[in-house]
């Protein structure tokens, strides 16, 4: 541990205090453990499920089972290759005799010294090949990152759920974005940047989701799928996407009804992005990032979307590191960074709720942002059947 992340010397002009914290960040390698028995039983279960008769499994579930099986098998091979002998063994568990694990040391780096940090493994490839279904499933290229950061959610509980907790920044990007205007120094020509509708969404997300799902008659999905579909709308809007495009691509139909609140949110987010790019704090960074994105051949709007995304992810990562430090101060061991959250090893002598509240206070003191931390389902779910219906 203590290795400087590759790319941290390539940063642009980030806001002063944030830049100073990033410069001091040296704790960017984490020991990650994998449950040996959990990996084995995952492969066995997925083999069995992928061969079930059509009366027991849908065609989509069979594709998902085969995809997860291939991932688990490749994961096993890479884990055997990369597992550090000094980390393998048993995690002490009071009263339980320990859990047999494979251990790996992951180094995290940021691209151009900004945005999120991603995992690497020395001398090994960073990816597991997806295949055609995997690429369509995840809407991205044919490689999926190795490690818990890139692991499908359906497998995480089997791989680490016996001994890890999943700590998450609740509604992370909307919560950050709503607080951004109060942290900007703007030219005199700018008035106040107000986000009343977007702030209401951030605070009452579930009721907004239900209203929008009802308006657009999203009824053929599970509750979790409905929620993710509507959340996707607001993610798109934050980064310059269009209401109409969301309906075409996610609902597979033209936009037939408009939610007035969503239209107001669109207008507010346009003003927010413009203000961030014009601000004293982020203007220099934004100009450099816009130029870098343009050099990739992107059009103007795509450059703006990417740049705003990098800015929010940079703030997110800064907050996440403060959380990591706060947990470590209390004796917790972080194993994995997962964008707006992290995994920590269970310790029966420590109280997770106390750590969550302590980290929230630390984030408020250090960064000025008010966040809510929550534990997502993971710990203790290692014996649950693997979910083949995607949320």
Task: Walk through the language-model features, giving the residues of each.
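Helical catalytic core of nucleic-acid polymerases
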Residues: 142-303
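Short glycine-/aliphatic-rich beta-strand segments at the starts of folded cytosolic domains
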Residues: 300-315
